[in-house]
Structure formats: C-alpha cells, structure tokens
A protein has these predicted regions:
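Conserved acidic donor-binding segment of nucleotide-sugar-dependent glycosyltransferases
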Residues: 335-336, 340-347, 356-361
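Conserved donor-binding/catalytic core segment of Leloir-type glycosyltransferases
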Residues: 207, 212-241
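Carbohydrate-associated surface elements
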Residues: 181, 202
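Short glycine-rich donor-binding/catalytic loop of glycosyltransferases
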Residues: 302, 319, 323-330, 344-345
C-alpha cells in the first residue's frame, strides 16, 4: 500500500508525543513493506519567516494556499492509496484536506488532542479541568484568552476550527481517536459514528522486561514527562512532600525526567530534597532504562489525557503505574490489577500510594507482571499496526463523496 503521512511538527522547544508516534508508525509501516512518505512542515520555521509573512500567520492557520499547492504536487507524483493526517496546526492548515479531495485520495485523520473543540487543546484552564467549550460554543475560550494568553491568538484558533467544521465532517473517510474517553469528549463534533474508530497509540518495545522472580531492590519511583501544571508537576511535588513527611529519610527515591515551563521551579524544589534526582531530557532508550530501575511510574496529570505514551512504555517494561483517575488513564490502567489510580485533586492520596509502594514491594512486582500482560494483550505492536491497516483499507473502500 502507498501511504502518505501528513504532519505539522510541534516546536522543538516543546517535545511532543505526536511527533514520536508519526516517526514510529512511519518506520513500522515501511518495515512491513509499505511505500510510505512523509509530507511535513515544522512550526520552528515560523521564527525564520520575514515580518510580512509572520503577519499573515492568522490567515494561513485557516487556509494556507502554499501547502495546498505543495501537497497537490506530492499527491500527483506519489499517487498514494491513502493519506493519513496527524496535525495541521499552525502551518499546514485544513487546506491539505482539499488537496486530497481534489486528487481523489481518501483521508484518515488521527485526533491526538481536543483542539477541534478546545482552543488550548487540553480542556484545562487556570489549574482545573474545563469543559466550557465541549458543546461546540467557543466564546468562553476567546473570553478567557485560552490560547497563549491572547484573545487574538485564541480567536484565530477558534475561527480555524469553526470555519472548517464541515471540512472535518465531510472530507475525512475515517477518524482515529486514541482513547474512548477522548472520543466521548469530542462528541460535540458530531462525527459520523460509522467512520469513527478507537486505536491506541503505537508503542514498540523489544528490550529487557522486569523479572518478577528476581529480588526487587528498587526503591525508586519515576516521573517522565513535561514539567507543567497540566501534567501535574505541582501535584507531584505536593504529594512527594506529604509522603516524605510521613516516611522520613529511609524511604523511596524520586527520579524526574523531562523539561518544560516549570523546570526552574522543580529544580529549585529538588535542590532542597536529596531524595529527588533530576535526570533531564532523555532519549527513548534511556527512558526505558530509567523505567526499568523503578518500582512504579507516577502519572499525576491534572488534565484529562487523551492517551499517555508513558503508560504503555512502563507496561512494556513490566512496571506498574500510579495514575490520576480521569481521562484516558481510567481506561488504560486498571486499579489494583496493573497499577493504582488516585484522585488528581488529592496529593494526600498520592502520598498514601507511595507509602504502599515502599511497604509492599511484592504487591508491586505482581502489578508489574500484570502490566506486562496488559501490554502483550492490549498494546501488542503487530496487532496495533494491523488495526491501522484495516482502517486504511476501510477508508479506501469507503471514500467520502466529493462535495
């Protein structure tokens, strides 16, 4: 099958799981013998634009004639069987869907976030989950300057999604949601249910797995991810302090891998706490290695995650999760089976779980064994890719009519 992936990469200063998913799937599909190409643009390129071109960005977000023209050329030359769109914001724009329509090529789109209904893409505002725009009315987003703290930037983002609502509904042959909880929260888009599918993100792993029979010397838990409020950095710090206040000095260690807007705050906090180690930004092999050194992985997200690559990465290694009990985490992690869930509004609940992790190592070895089983049964890479190919075949067999 000839497959063209279309993706607008996020800024290099804000590493994205979406970028990783695109790269991993491209490599895997090519390994299976498919002819795969990637049509992409970089958000970083905006910084290099001349002033006059930057001034046109609000209009280009909504309709970029240059990318439509360039993609049309690629479609004529490559003649793919299917186009798989990931992200079109901000450089590509929904104009790419019209290029595909004009070329008569069916489109599959993966919805990685909540951007079509939420200007910030995460249903999170001022430290709390927010569903004010979930019904389809975007005015609260503009009123609250939800995108980059700017009413103008928010209005541009909202205008893009609202003006192309029928584009998303009429020019896409198949929609891929990355969790059932995400599909539920995006119900306000009124997508055709017959063309909507849930497919978890692809996470390949062929490295070492924790040996449940081995003695468990690990007295460490790990956080891997972006350091910001939505990802739960404040909750992590409060929960850790509450735990150490009870446990004292002879207790677990905390390893933190990642960067982000709260890096300086987390660094200052960790400086006074010998039990906390900052590992910085790590590549994928080092992330898996760090997870393997841990008794559990902590996921304290305060926003309702659409997925969570770290969940599956930990399961692949055989390490259980301590995760916030909302969003996709309630779907991915089964409390008491392959991890434990806690109220994201309760740092004391996280502290109690950390006490349990240290006091009951055998229990968490068992949870880790179950986590690995979950990976093998629910997140098997080959089954995941087969599901993706089935959706491609569906799109080819059921193209939307030109309108």
């Amino acid at each position: 099958m000839k497959i063209l992936l279309v993706h607008n990469r996020y800024r290099s200063t804000a590493p994205s799981g979406e970028n990783r998913v695109v790269d991993q799937e491209r490599e895997a599909l090519a390994t299976l013998g498919h002819d795969v190409r990637l049509f992409e643009r970089q958000s970083d390129e905006i910084e290099e634009w001349p002033a006059w071109k930057k001034a046109t960005l609000p209009a280009r977000v909504i309709w970029n004639p240059t990318t439509k023209r360039d993609l049309s050329v690629e479609l004529r030359e490559f003649q793919p069987d299917v186009v798989h769109v990931h992200n079109t914001f901000p450089v590509l724009s929904p104009s790419v869907l019209y290029a595909c329509r004009d070329a008569g090529v069916p489109v599959v789109i993966t919805l990685h976030n909540y951007k079509l209904l939420c200007a910030s893409g995460d249903f999170y505002r001022e430290g709390s989950v927010c569903h004010d725009c979930a019904g389809g009315n975007p005015l609260p987003a503009v009123r609250n300057s939800c995108y980059r703290g700017s009413k103008l930037a928010t209005a541009t983002t909202v205008l893009n999604t609202r003006s192309h609502r029928r584009t998303w509904q009429n020019l896409v042959s198949a929609y891929l949601f990355i969790s059932e909880s995400q599909r539920t929260l995006l119900a306000g888009m009124d997508f055709d249910a017959d063309r909507s599918f849930v497919r978890y993100n692809y996470v390949p792993y062929d490295g070492p797995v924790i040996d449940p029979a081995a003695k468990d010397p690990r007295r460490q838990v790990t956080y891997v991810g972006r350091l910001d409020a939505a990802k739960g950095a404040p909750l992590l710090m409060k929960g850790w302090d509450a735990y150490r206040a009870i446990a004292g000095d002879d207790a677990l260690q905390l390893a933190i891998a990642g960067g982000g807007p709260m890096l300086d705050e987390v660094t200052a906090w960790a400086a006074d706490r010998p039990s906390v180690q900052l590992r910085g930004m790590l590549g994928k092999p080092d992330i898996f290695s760090l997870i393997g050194e841990s008794r559990a992985v902590v996921l304290p997200s305060e926003w309702e995650e659409t997925f969570g690559l770290v969940v599956v990465e930990a399961m692949a290694v055989g390490v259980p999760l301590l995760a916030s009990a909302h969003g996709s985490f309630r779907e991915l992690v089964t409390d008491g089976v392959d991890g434990a869930l806690f109220d994201p509004g309760r740092p004391d609940e996280l502290a109690k779980l950390l006490l349990d992790v240290d006091a009951c190592p055998d229990k968490y070895v068992d949870l880790g064994r179950n986590a690995r089983t979950t990976y093998e049964t629910t997140h098997d890479p080959q089954s995941n890719l087969q599901q993706l190919l089935d959706v491609y075949r569906f799109a080819v067999a059921n193209p939307v009519p030109s309108r």
